[in-house]
Amino acid sequence: MANPTVIKLQDGNVMPQLGLGVWQASNEEVITAIQKALEVGYRSFDTAAAYKNEEGVGKALKNASVNREELFITTKLWNDDHNRPREALLDSLKKLQLDYIDLYLMHWPVPAIDHYVEAWKGMIELQKEGLIKSIGVCNFQIHHLQRLIDETGVTPVINQIELHPLMQQRQLHAWNATHKIQTESWSPLAQGGKGVFDQKVIRDLADKYGKTPAQIVIRWHLDSGLVVIPKSVTPSRIAENFDVWDFRLDKDELGEIAKLDQGKRLGPDPDQFGG
């Protein structure tokens, strides 16, 4: 089996290409999930202030027999805190029982409030202080990103967006790449695979490689150059989602999956959400 792959970000920092997302998990569920994930080989964990489970993540990491330097921890600045990123980050650090965050993401742009540039400036300062290694955003459209770059001169290293076979966001993915912004996929399995896992191309590839539909879709993300964070609290699924290093999809197979794109957004519209 090949080793899990890593991605080098434009700021020089390195992150695992595959991590565990913990959205919708309770503090108790998160502790068990992370323990299992660490056993399997995960080293990247993605939480957020809005998930209300940073304390559980912190407890799990405190109990882990893995060095802090081997871990890659992501959390996020919530919409209500755009005008107080320092206080929000310090609160997250306290709950996570950490001295620094590997990746701090602004969760949504919330253009209706229009504080995202100021929030970004605050995040830049926190990075300079060493409280954050890398800074990025979630759910930013091209015009939001361009404004950040124009007004601060600092480009996010990550744009974490809804991305799955039904919503491939190719234009945004390409724009990110042109600007050396790594695209990261949330809801990578289209919320449990509905409308994806039963597609003939996915089933055929699962049969060909002796894998599950979920593993095929995760491999599609990896082979498309995306960072991917499937979420689960089920031990067997956590292990299954990480067992993707012994095969690759070829260019034609990636092209077949590309045909599934419907522009079907399952989550909120970033231009409308919040406020």
Swiss-Prot record:
Name of the gene: dkgA
Localization per record: Cytoplasm
Family matches, as InterPro entries: AKR, AKR5C2, Aldo/ket_reductase_CS, NADP_OxRdtase_dom, NADP_OxRdtase_dom_sf
PANTHER family on file: 2,5-DIKETO-D-GLUCONIC ACID REDUCTASE, NADP-DEPENDENT OXIDOREDUCTASE DOMAIN-CONTAINING PROTEIN
GO biological process, one term: L-ascorbic acid biosynthetic process
Pfam families per the UniProt record, alphabetical: Aldo_ket_red
Listed name of the protein: Methylglyoxal reductase DkgA
GO MF: 2,5-didehydrogluconate reductase activity; aldo-keto reductase (NADPH) activity
Parts forming coiled coils: none
